[in-house]
């Protein structure tokens, strides 16, 4: 048996069994898995890297299950695939890479990126993931059109990173509580909703302009690689966010219905030519894909306080970090090495305390079982803050649905002309996305 290739895959709860002491023969390859949402759950230790069987990875860009499926559109951010698979290779996961694709058509670019990285990771690293995507678009549509399309696709991936089209109904799958089957408000204020709708509207318009200028022989390729994924995602957001506004008397229900009809029309167009029967906009017939039920609410929309200062990880004035190209809510998240510091500066503060909201990538520990950081203001004492999650906990579900892990704290602040906020990573694997400063609002 030692000569027969064998693989052990500690998927989901099986990883807990492995961590509890399960012994695997040395010649068996250990196949590490992501959490189904793009974040690898375990990286091999030095002992595991030395095993005869080596290490592999089983990675998802499509998933059926809790907290919610994403089977329709290929929206896993290429920068996340790049960041996680680069880290996997650096950590000794080099024997075998397996990609769970689901429906291959919506995810053609991510599949190509994954395979190119598996074949020659250094070549992809040298050009960067943005350049890789641009070359993909140039090959299909020519240089000039690729120059115009790449920012469109990058923005489409960024918006879907914040929340996937399939997650826009604030519903869940495979939950016992029936409330998760009912479309409900996302925790967004009116301004956030309108800004997101405007961003998608702008993308959709740009895609439509290119469509009309395309030669006939390129229209089918363009429709399934660009027009359908961007405009269908835009209409999904339009359908559900307009409905959220309409529930509070802030929009017309007819706009939500028209968005649903647009998705139906786009999908029909997809399935009437070369790619007939390849696209289904209602995988598993989940509630989020239906026309939204008209239901008025007496309560108002969520109101959020305005942050006084906001920074992306890359906005630090001092410190050593690695920018994760394109990753994060604004594409400027940074990987912070263990014990390294990032410094952010702000002006005089009006009160004697400040609420600090730290937003991080919801990834898993790289070494050991912890993900921790500290925050220090003007040299104040620090306290370790943990944000790793366990299994399929409620916090983990919330994290993967919104692609951030959030921690809040209130710190005392002195009356002075300027201040220095220092973020320190205590463990490997810390990726800082954003920091927000508010007037205190938590107890």
List each language-model region with its residue ranges:
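Catalytic-core region of carbohydrate-active enzymes that cleave or remodel glycosidic bonds
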Residues: 72-99, 116-121, 254-264
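Extracytoplasmic
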Residues: 283-443
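Aromatic- and carboxylate-enriched substrate-binding clefts and catalytic-loop regions
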Residues: 5-40, 47, 73, 95-149, ...
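C-terminal non-catalytic alpha-helical accessory regions
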Residues: 133-287
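Beta-sheet entry/capping signal
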Residues: 3-7, 27-30, 54-56, 93-97, ...
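Gly/Pro-rich turn-and-neighbor structural signature
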Residues: 1-52, 194-221, 236
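Short alpha-helical segments and helix-capping/turn motifs at coil-helix boundaries
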Residues: 12-18, 38-43, 79-84, 341, ...
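Active-site clefts of carbohydrate-active enzymes
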Residues: 52-76
